[in-house]
């Protein structure tokens, strides 16, 4: 080989390990998803579809019976680097990647190669291969989601009765437990798992229905037979392509799952602030948080996840835009999907794995949680006092006004809500000391076990 040919060979080998569309940056590829969207795997799936079609056509007497075996023999040990080079060269001439692909396979196969792609249109191959890849991608996403569920469940059960102040609008509300907080994220992740399974079913449809979807060349029976061989479903009614609402469902599901990860990441970020200090994501001994400030411990993984979730929402919109193609199809979807499908699946895969690592290594500061709760007194018990007054016969509006006054005084003067209530003439007259103390004696975690039971019992 000349020096230039050697460089081209090395470039092609590198390209085979990169995504077919070269969209996702290397920084966020994980090996499993990178391999799935590699150019080599894309070409392998195209070959797989072509061979499955040839087998079915031979079985139904459409092409000679010996053709599939001859094709399989010709493609044994197929050099995908050479196939990619051939495709690249011919695509410059044809300006059509599938036409170039079929022409290259025909060269490899020799005389039996004339039966390749018999009765097919390009997207019979592309969409059916996409279904194979997307089905496997969804399987990887489900597996990662289940790993996150396991980590969340373990951490939630560990902290079932670890008290933490609940906050609404960013302001102290009433106590809850860290376990219940994490259990909520577990339940949301479980729902995202179910949505991913539904989306996996939705995208597991291929088509061999020809140029406008009427199956007039090969027939619906052959389409069904090939899909059974590939472990897919035949699209009930297609055009030249599988309807894009299927892809839109997947991209929307991915965006929803990403938003769930973003919500968890945001919670960790907020509780990791210096003035809160209740938890922190893992931080390695040799890790550095700033080029200028050695003391910094930034929640960079959670921040990264939040940024990626924004990308996923954009891809969900792309999926919706791709639904309305012209008549029996145009090609406006193609360029968008070459980016959106590998990027979105790969990003969610990365985000989910990283969040699992964060949850497993989450640093919990229970002492700081307790300190934060006690630092500002017990005015958060105001609802208990309100309910006691209502039970004693006071109108809700009047009772609310009294307790608001007592709570404000407790905050302003730094005294307990009980002392403030006993110093409030109307409250003290209605409840007296024993009634106030009894009203404020409350276990905020009394129903934690029941909530855990109803969430986890089905699992």
Regions found by a protein language model. Give the residues of each.
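Short, contiguous, pocket-lining structural segments
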Residues: 144, 170, 174-184, 188, ...
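Acidic, Ala/Val/Gly-enriched low-complexity intrinsically disordered segments
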Residues: 5-9
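A helix-coil-helix interface module used to build multimeric assemblies
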Residues: 20-209, 215, 220-225, 234, ...
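Acidic, glycine-rich loop-and-beta core segments that form the ion-binding/anion-interacting portion
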Residues: 223-316
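Catalytic-core signal marking the mid-to-C-terminal active-site face
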Residues: 23-41, 84-85, 91-93, 100, ...
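A general structural motif at alpha-helix termini
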Residues: 71-75, 241, 272, 283, ...
């Amino acid at each position: 080989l000349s020096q230039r040919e050697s460089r081209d060979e090395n470039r092609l080998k590198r390209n085979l390990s990169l995504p077919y569309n070269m969209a996702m940056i290397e920084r966020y590829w994980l090996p499993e998803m990178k391999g799935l969207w590699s150019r080599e795997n894309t070409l392998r799936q195209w070959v797989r579809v072509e061979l499955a079609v040839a087998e079915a056509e031979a079985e139904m007497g459409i092409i000679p019976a010996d053709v599939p075996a001859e094709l399989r023999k010709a493609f044994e040990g197929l050099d995908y680097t050479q196939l990619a080079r051939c495709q690249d060269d011919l695509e410059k001439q044809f300006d059509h990647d599938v036409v170039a692909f079929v022409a290259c396979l025909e060269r490899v196969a020799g005389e039996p190669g004339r039966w390749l792609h018999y009765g097919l249109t390009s997207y019979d191959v592309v969409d059916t291969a996409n279904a194979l890849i997307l089905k496997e991608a969804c399987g990887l996403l489900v597996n990662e989601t289940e790993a996150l569920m396991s980590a969340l469940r373990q951490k939630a059960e560990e902290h079932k009765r670890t008290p933490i102040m609940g906050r609404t609008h960013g302001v102290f509300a009433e106590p809850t437990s860290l376990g219940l907080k994490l259990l909520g994220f577990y339940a949301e992740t479980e729902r995202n798992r179910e949505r991913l399974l539904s989306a996996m079913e939705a995208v597991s449809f291929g088509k061999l229905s020809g140029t406008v979807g009427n199956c007039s060349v090969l027939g619906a029976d052959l389409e069904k037979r090939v899909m059974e061989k590939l472990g897919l479903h035949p699209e009930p009614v297609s055009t030249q392509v599988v309807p894009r609402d299927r892809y839109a469902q997947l991209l929307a599901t991915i965006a929803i799952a990403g938003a769930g990860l973003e919500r968890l990441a945001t919670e960790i970020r907020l509780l990791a602030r210096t003035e809160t200090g209740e938890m922190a994501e893992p931080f390695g001994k040799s890790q550095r948080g700033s080029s200028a400030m050695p003391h910094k411990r930034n929640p960079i993984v959670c921040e990264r996840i939040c940024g990626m979730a924004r990308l996923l929402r954009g891809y969900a919109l792309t999926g919706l835009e791709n639904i309305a193609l012209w008549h029996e199809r145009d090609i406006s979807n193609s360029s968008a999907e070459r980016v959106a499908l590998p990027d979105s699946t790969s990003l969610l895969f990365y985000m989910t794995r990283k969040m699992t690592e964060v949850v497993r290594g989450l640093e919990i500061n229970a002492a700081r949680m307790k300190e934060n709760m006690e630092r500002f007194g017990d005015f958060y018990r105001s609802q208990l006092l309100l309910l006691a007054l209502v039970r004693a016969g006071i109108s809700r509006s009047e009772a609310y006004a009294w307790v608001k006054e007592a709570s404000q005084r407790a905050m302003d003067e730094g005294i307990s809500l009980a002392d403030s209530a006993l110093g409030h003439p109307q409250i003290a007259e209605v409840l007296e000391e024993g009634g106030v103390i009894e009203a404020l004696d409350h276990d905020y975690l009394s129903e934690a076990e029941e909530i855990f039971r109803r969430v986890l019992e089905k699992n």
